[in-house]
Design a protein with these regions (language model features):
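Catalytic cores of nucleotide-sugar-dependent glycosyltransferases that transfer UDP/GDP/TDP-activated
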Residues: 1-301
């Protein structure tokens, strides 16, 4: 939002830079509305096709914020939401191609716009590295195939989880996301906390981003994490719920999926809406069953 007043200056300087290089683009690809605005300016100047990937869209965000009780004046003050939506309409009117992750994205997000039928759409789902996210039972077949880093990550994550659990041998319900309201972490903790039978059957592990000091984090992240901790305390989930502070994505996240799969657990994505859901692909590739929101990309997956 803070970038909007500076985009025209950025366009001018980008044009000058490209002209100095003496090499001109064959096409321009913009991501998100601010870069989309820059993209349409550059494509018009150089006479090249323009491709757009929105990732998230303003009209859908506005609808969510209204549901949460935020007024339009506050939305425009904090997010310049109406300016964003107007810009997205301009982008769709001028885009030669729009790239999405799912068909749901075309129907439910771009479908809210007046200019939705102007561009062509291409659905290109994200993928994963199956050398990294391999089935959990491969570790049993040939341990020599896997690096020392992989084995260390497995042991490290087991140790991290076990320090939270009274009975670490139970199946593991695993959730992994950034601390964002839309990810519905508090809803997951509430559902687990209110189901005594589920608590008896399985442990819950929530990896909610990376943190050192919650007080030093952004206000929205602090709010999500505080809600999670309060819910954990309310339902007295000590010994049943793990809330580790950190993990690395290269080795420890794949190890977490395999640990959960080996315990006969599940991976859950409880988000209110999910544009795609890459973690669902990662988890399923390791042999871990998935439970997902019925909104957005998981329907395509």
């Amino acid at each position: 939002e803070l970038l909007w007043p500076h985009l025209d200056e950025y366009v001018d300087k980008t044009i000058k830079f490209i002209r100095r290089q003496g090499r001109y683009p064959d096409f321009v690809h913009g991501h998100y509305p601010d870069a989309g605005y820059v993209g349409i300016c550059l494509s018009e100047y150089f006479g090249t096709p323009f491709i757009y990937t929105g990732h998230s869209m303003g009209r859908a965000k506005k609808a969510r914020l209204l549901e949460q009780g935020m007024g339009e004046a506050e939305m425009n003050k904090r997010f310049k939401i109406d300016h964003r939506i107007q810009t997205e309409e301009q982008i769709l009117a001028r885009a030669d191609l729009v790239v999405t992750s799912t068909h749901h994205e075309i129907e439910k997000q771009y479908g809210l716009y007046d200019n939705r039928q102007v561009p062509r759409y291409a659905v290109i789902p994200p993928g994963i590295d199956i050398e990294t996210f391999y089935p959990y039972y491969h570790d049993k077949l040939d341990e020599s195939e896997h690096s020392e880093n992989t084995r260390y990550a497995q042991a490290s994550m087991l140790g991290e989880l076990n320090r939270f659990f009274l009975n670490p041998d139970k199946p593991l319900i695993l959730a992994l996301s950034r601390p964002d309201k839309r990810k519905n972490i508090s809803g997951l903790v509430k559902a687990y906390g209110e189901d005594l039978e589920l608590q008896a059957m399985a442990n819950l592990a929530v990896f909610a981003g990376l943190r050192k000091d919650i007080d030093a984090m952004a206000e929205n992240e602090k709010e999500v994490l505080t809600e999670m901790l309060l819910a954990m305390d309310k339902y007295d989930l000590y010994g049943k719920m793990a809330i580790p502070k950190k993990h690395d994505f290269e080795y420890e996240v794949p190890a977490l999926y395999r640990i959960a799969a080996e315990t006969k657990g599940v991976f859950i994505n409880p988000a209110l809406t999910e544009p795609f859901g890459l973690t669902l692909l990662e988890a399923s590739a390791t042999g871990l069953p998935i439970v997902a929101t019925d909104d957005g990309g998981p329907n395509d997956i």
